């Protein structure tokens, strides 16, 4: 009886853990294409100020607020997040490979890792890998980068629309940019989702140099 009960509990535990595991990635659809066809995925030239609303779902907690991104091509961005009701704020600066997110834990939960943050802005910048597989399906180009796969990128035309971080054949984190001015970041293991809705995007002449220091 004890062995049977122990076996049942163990099986149930394994099922629960399997249900919590990040999803496995499927094989890329479409026809093979040369890796040289992979778009560059760069930021638009110049400087832009982007205003957005954000919502963070982290377990049972939901937070909302407003934010501003100050973007300077080719490789600099400052993000400021303001919690609804004026109850807090956070900031991050990403310049090239250097990401600074000082302050409380909430700020770090609002900011994806470096490569995914760049992807949220439309810039394709992942660590170099020896193996890249590119396939095209119905005009959509997808690329698996690394062997085993570490990154999966999706392009519509020359525009980066989705970037996924993969580990052990499972989807760990992803960022998706849609045509309706929405951006979503999802951490599958942490069950955390950040959604942005862009309110405005304006070209500006310059930024005060002090914004790059936190």
Where are these regions (language model features)?
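Sec-dependent bacterial lipoprotein signal peptides
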Residues: 1-20
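N-terminal leader/targeting segments and the immediate start of mature chains
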Residues: 20-76, 86, 104-106, 129-132, ...
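Extended lipid/amphipathic-ligand handling interfaces
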Residues: 67-71, 92-98, 173-177
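A mature extracytoplasmic/lumenal domain signature
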Residues: 81-85, 94-98, 103-105, 167, ...
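Local beta-strand/beta-hairpin segments that build beta-sheet-rich folds
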Residues: 87-91, 150
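Acidic/charged, solvent-exposed loop-and-adjacent secondary-structure segments enriched in E/D, K/R, S/T
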Residues: 99-131
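Gly/Pro-enriched, hydrophobic low-complexity segments
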Residues: 134-214
């Amino acid at each position: 009886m004890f062995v049977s009960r122990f076996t049942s509990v163990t099986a149930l535990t394994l099922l629960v853990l399997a249900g919590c595991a990040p999803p496995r990635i499927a094989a890329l659809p479409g026809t093979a294409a040369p890796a040289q066809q992979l778009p560059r995925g760069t930021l638009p030239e110049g400087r832009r100020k982007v205003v957005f609303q954000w919502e963070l779902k982290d377990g049972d907690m939901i937070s909302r607020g407003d934010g501003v991104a100050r973007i300077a091509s080719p490789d600099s961005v400052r993000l400021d997040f303001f919690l609804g009701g004026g109850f807090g704020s956070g900031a991050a600066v990403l310049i090239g490979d250097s990401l600074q997110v000082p302050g409380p834990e909430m700020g770090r939960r609002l900011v994806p890792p470096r490569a995914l943050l760049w992807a949220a802005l439309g810039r394709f910048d992942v660590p170099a890998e020896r193996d890249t597989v590119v396939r095209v399906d119905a005009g959509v180009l997808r690329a698996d980068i690394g062997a085993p796969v570490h990154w999966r990128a999706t392009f519509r035309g020359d525009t980066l629309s989705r970037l996924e971080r993969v580990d052990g054949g499972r989807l760990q984190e992803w960022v998706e940019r849609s045509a309706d001015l929405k951006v979503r970041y999802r951490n599958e293991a942490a069950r955390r989702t950040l959604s942005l809705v862009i309110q405005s995007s304006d070209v500006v002449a310059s930024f005060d140099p002090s914004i790059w220091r936190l």
